[in-house]
């Protein structure tokens, strides 16, 4: 059985990790959310989240977006390529309900899988 934990090794923790992704990212996005990705040499994917107060005013909305994004990543982690991902929430993401946000994330994960196979 595949383990679906979300340990510390699967997170981008330092500013240097985020900068690495921002330097030469592969982009996949919708009007409300963008996922930047860059191949890593670790053999497993990692994720970092940026949900700015400027774009999502209420803390409980920011927390909901981060929670759903982490859960989506956790469930797909074994299907994703060995990349570092940064999820950037844009204006309007708070207007999406849980189902719409989950579907948007699934679509973006699939797009990143295709991009990684193509490169």
Swiss-Prot record:
NCBIfam families: rnpA. Its EC number is 3.1.26.5. The gene is rnpA. It comes from the Bacteria. RNaseP catalyzes the removal of the 5'-leader sequence from pre-tRNA to produce the mature 5'-terminus. It can also cleave other RNA substrates such as 4.5S RNA. The protein component plays an auxiliary but essential role in vivo by binding to the 5'-leader sequence and broadening the substrate specificity of the ribozyme. It catalyses: Endonucleolytic cleavage of RNA, removing 5'-extranucleotides from tRNA precursor. One of its GO terms (molecular function) is tRNA binding. PROSITE patterns: RIBONUCLEASE_P (PS00648). Pfam families: Ribonuclease_P (PF00825). GO terms for cellular component: ribonuclease P complex. Consists of a catalytic RNA component (M1 or rnpB) and a protein subunit. This is Ribonuclease P protein component.
């Amino acid at each position: 059985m595949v383990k679906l934990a979300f340990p510390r090794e699967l997170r981008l923790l330092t500013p240097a990790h985020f900068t690495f992704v921002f330097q030469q990212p592969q982009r996949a996005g919708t009007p409300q959310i963008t996922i930047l990705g860059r191949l890593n040499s670790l053999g497993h994917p990692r994720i970092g989240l940026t949900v700015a107060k400027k774009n999502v005013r209420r803390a409980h909305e920011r927390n909901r977006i981060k929670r759903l994004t982490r859960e989506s990543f956790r469930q797909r982690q074994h299907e994703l390529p060995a990349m570092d991902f940064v999820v950037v929430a844009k204006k309007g993401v708070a207007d999406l309900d849980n189902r719409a946000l989950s579907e948007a994330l699934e679509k973006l994960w699939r797009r990143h899988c295709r991009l990684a196979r193509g490169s």
